[in-house]
């Protein structure tokens, strides 16, 4: 989720004049946060551009981070993602891509629409 977050950005409208990281923001102005920027912050992540599935700690801001806008379904989503990847690894340990993924890209969303893969099914637990 840190590497390729499905929601790429969100915006908020300032309700009062404020300052953020030295930038003055007037009431009514919009502010956009790009998750990719936050999730690759060199002050938070050692070598943020390296893909490391075992990264620990991994304090990404997927599901809203913490605070009043924290996603109420975050724990269920994390558990579901873990179960899905564990099942894939168990049943298709030799899963290999056949081609490049077909991606859905927009100003706000990032997803894989279609990705053809192959596996031998030689695992003892293969479906």
Segments from the language model and where they lie:
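Conserved cytochrome P450 K-helix E-x-x-R motif and the immediately C-terminal K′/meander segment
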Residues: 1-21
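Cytochrome P450
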Residues: 5-8, 37-43, 47, 91-96, ...
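Cytochrome P450 heme-binding Cys-pocket and its upstream "meander" loop
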Residues: 38-79
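Conserved N-terminal glycine/acidic-rich loop preference
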Residues: 67, 75, 105-124
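Cytochrome P450 heme-binding "Cys pocket" and the immediately downstream C-terminal segment
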Residues: 76-104
